[in-house]
């Protein structure tokens, strides 16, 4: 089985930054990978297109995926509002790791984060389901618009997304 690849085209205050592509580890976490893939294509009638990265902390991560409330309190999965932690096989080994944001055990929705450093303290708490394939330089550019409290100096938006 070939793992799916999806892409995000990123803008900062409507200025194009570029494209980030992700490999989704459907071989290890099929349910979590399928949620992210379908939210990237928008095939269920809702998803990531037009949503923003509401929290970016340089040297840590870029968080997005709240397409319902746009502030980190919302989002929904393709399985209903929330779904369970599939497994913790994969670890937060360094920059480019794609992982699910949550509000505690078994509260996965649509929010996710892209690591910009090794974040091993998140192992066993957040489900890793992918990694940046191309465009880590774009993630680094996004990081420059973040701050220590996570507030962004420009609106970092997923202007387009889909499956490659």
Swiss-Prot record:
Activity regulation description: Binds cyclosporin A (CsA). CsA mediates some of its effects via an inhibitory action on PPIase.
One of the record's GO molecular function terms: heparan sulfate binding
Alphabetized CDD domains for the sequence: cyclophilin_ABH_like
Enzyme class at the top of the EC tree: isomerase
Compartment list: Cytoplasm; Secreted; Nucleus
Keyword rRNA processing: no
EC number(s) on file: 5.2.1.8
Positions carrying N6-acetyllysine: 28, 44, 82, 125, 131, 133
Sugar-bearing residue positions: 108
Domain of life: Eukaryota
Residue positions where N-acetylmethionine is found in the record: 1
Subunit structure: Interacts with protein phosphatase PPP3CA/calcineurin A. Interacts with PRPF19 isoform 2 (via N-terminus). Interacts with isoform 2 of BSG/CD147. Interacts with FOXO1; the interaction promotes FOXO1 dephosphorylation, nuclear accumulation and transcriptional activity. Interacts with integrin ITGA2B:ITGB3; the interaction is ROS and PPIase activity-dependent and is increased in the presence of thrombin. Interacts with MAP3K5. Interacts with TARDBP.
Protein function: Catalyzes the cis-trans isomerization of proline imidic peptide bonds in oligopeptides. Exerts a strong chemotactic effect on leukocytes partly through activation of one of its membrane receptors BSG/CD147, initiating a signaling cascade that culminates in MAPK/ERK activation. Activates endothelial cells (ECs) in a pro-inflammatory manner by stimulating activation of NF-kappa-B and ERK, JNK and p38 MAP-kinases and by inducing expression of adhesion molecules including SELE and VCAM1.
Protein name stated in the entry: Peptidyl-prolyl cis-trans isomerase A
UniProt gene name: Ppia
